[in-house]
Amino acid sequence: MSLFSIIKDCGGIHNIQRVLIPDSRIIIEIHEFELLSAEAKQQAYNLTLKQVTYQQTVIENKDEFGAQLLEIGQLISDQQRQDITPYTAPVECEFRPDWHISPPQGLLNDPNGFIYHQGQYHLFYQWYPYTCVHKDKYWAHLTSKDLVNWQWQPVALTPSDWFDSYGVFSGHAISQDDLLMLFYTGNVRIGEQRDRHTTQCLATSTDGIHFTKQGPVVPELPPGVTPHCRDPKVIRHNDRWLMLLGVQREDEIGRLAIYHSEDLKTWTFIALCGDELGDFGYMWECPDFFTLNQQDFIVIGPQGIRSPDKSHTAPHHNGIVKAQLETSGKALLSDFQPLDYGFDFYAPQSLETPDGRRIMCAWMGLPDEIDHPSADNGWVHQLTTMRELSYDNGALIQKPIKELATLRHTPIVLSKDETSFDLHSKAFELQVSMQWGSVLRLHQSESGYCEIRLDSASRRLYIDRSNTLIREGDTVREMSLAESDSVQLHIFSDTSSLEVFINEGEAVMSARVFTDKNSTQLSFDGDVQIQACWLLNKASAPFIS
């Protein structure tokens, strides 16, 4: 018996949801029981999971089994691509951003595979197209020449194979001459208890558009680690390849696992890293690695650490640590600091541009928050703006990329005698100087606003979105600032977001801000000097191929 004959007995490829091969079994998850053949109905069947189970001993030619699995996966992928076609058309919504990346429909989360390859930028993101829930993720694919205007490409990866049928989870990309290589986590669930199985997988493309899955390249878990092992980042270091993985130890402590390889296909475990940080969260996600001004950094997403301020109640954090890579490949980590002090920033990825800049973007959301007003229109979440990173005089600096200046429309001249203005748009760039004790309100109308205030007594900056249409999540973020006479803010606003770069990029605060479509006013109390203001044009919609 071949795998193809099993598929036929189970109603054909159009009746197949997924194929799983745990232990010595072959599990076929189906859509309709009535389409099973009489022989298939004699096999063990789980009514709850709609799964038919065969023993692998029924396979006559074991040598062809692996190739047949990949071929079946490709057939399932072809069907999935047909099924998602209606969901690639963007739905209209008053909260749709003018110049940020958002999904046409469904749910967006982590950016993936952010890289410059063969003359253009590639950016992928986690996407579930059907509804606004976290489930069975795809890799959506965009390309750009300028990091501002993005073009939709065919979906790169679908959850179609035995090693990733419950989600092609996050990962990174490597550019090797003409070859674009995607490393990602394959997620699988087994049984009614939904036991998690994760492997680190590879897909390759010679044209940068169409990808062929190669299957797992790290098929086993690191020693002492739970199946919470994901998000591979591959780097070149000391003439060999290293893979960084976010993991959870069996004692539920987050750590970084590191592997090495000579050929990008065979990987050997080196070590778990991060003990010097102590008990630092129950899971680390989405590692990244880069060097700024001769200092190595690793980005981690520690879940469950202590929040930097009392108003931050979410367990999900993102930050950067200094890294010292030993010759063995093991990393010593120190000096964790948040990458963003706002509400909505997670799972960042970075790349190096041809002119040597380090550019980062992130998911402008958090894992547990999906009930946004846009969900009523069938989509949720967006990515942050692109930031340029530098390391100067011992400080990490983040600034908006210079390419954003191409979006500037006619400068807006605001009277120094007025304290309230109607910009007639939520898409704008604003440079202001605020004295302590002053308040700035944005996205304002009679129905609400978002407030930025400087508290003189505590020397803290607050962003307060409690007077907006927010449905879940924190409403206030705060951070301490160094002693100064004034605070310089460089603000980028879109239809439903604000990103505030503080004191020439010493800190950033990002926020999704939902207000009604007429909330286009700006006002302030106290000593606020508006230094420059531009309305921003729309970027190319990231849904158009």
Curated annotation (Swiss-Prot):
Pfam families: Glyco_hydro_32C (PF08244), Glyco_hydro_32N (PF00251). Its EC number is 3.2.1.26. It catalyses: Hydrolysis of terminal non-reducing beta-D-fructofuranoside residues in beta-D-fructofuranosides. It is found in: Cytoplasm. Substrate binds at residues 107-110, 126, 169-170, 230-231, 285. It is an enzyme of class 3 (hydrolase). GO terms for biological process: sucrose metabolic process. InterPro entries: ConA-like_dom_sf (IPR013320), GH32_Enzymes (IPR051214), Glyco_hydro_32 (IPR001362), Glyco_hydro_32_AS (IPR018053), Glyco_hydro_32_C (IPR013189), Glyco_hydro_32_N (IPR013148), Glyco_hydro_beta-prop_sf (IPR023296), Suc6P_hydrolase (IPR006232). The active site is at 110. Enables the bacterium to metabolize sucrose as a sole carbon source. This is Probable sucrose-6-phosphate hydrolase.
